[in-house]
Every structure is written in C-alpha cells, then in structure tokens.
C-alpha cells in the first residue's frame, strides 16, 4: 500500500502527542492549585489528536479492504495501531483520574 509508512508515522505521532498531553494534564491535576481550564484544554487537544490518528487508522483499514491486502502483516502498522490504542486507554483512564483529583481537591478545600 502506497503511503502506509507515512500514515503509520502520522498515527504514531498524534497518539504520542496525545499521551504526552494526558500525562501533563494528570500531573497538573495533582498540583496544590490546579488550573482546570488549562487541564481541560490539554484533554481537548489530546482528544483532537486522537481523532486525527483514528481518521488515519480508518484510511489504512479502508485501503487494506479495497486492495485485498487486509491479511498482510506490517510491523510498523501494528506498532502504530498499538500506540493509538494505548493513547485511547490513557484518555479514558486519565480523564477519570483527573475527575477524581478534582473531587479530592474540592474535599480538601472544605476541610
């Protein structure tokens, strides 16, 4: 498939960027006085980056289906898909952790 390598690197790049933003957001959420507006922006940017990765992933799947090469194994594609899937899991888990940190912060302020 033509351009597969470039698409894989696009998926890897956007997924990695999303994971970095998510780690920064969760770290910031544990600060003494977290800026939840900035944290929400990081979460949005991570989601947006993942949407780009998912769109590229869908193109690869579509191209595989149309070309009949769907059973071909490409290690770079497997790595790209793994990076995207782990970023999606990060998004789900760290979003919940940030919500928990926010609730803990509210409880601390009441004490």
Regions inferred by a protein language model and the residue ranges of each:
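Terminal alpha-helical segments
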Residues: 1-111
């Amino acid at each position: 498939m033509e351009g597969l390598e470039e698409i894989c690197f696009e998926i890897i790049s956007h997924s990695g960027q999303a994971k970095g933003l998510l780690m920064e957001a969760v770290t910031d959420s544990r600060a003494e006085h977290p800026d939840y507006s900035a944290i929400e922006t990081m979460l949005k940017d991570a989601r947006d980056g993942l949407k780009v990765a998912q769109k590229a992933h869908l193109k690869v799947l579509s191209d595989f289906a149309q070309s009949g090469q769907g059973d071909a194994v490409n290690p770079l594609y497997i790595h790209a898909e793994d990076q995207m899937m782990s970023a999606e899991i990060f998004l789900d888990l760290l979003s919940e952790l940030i919500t928990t940190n926010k609730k803990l912060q509210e409880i601390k302020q009441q004490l």
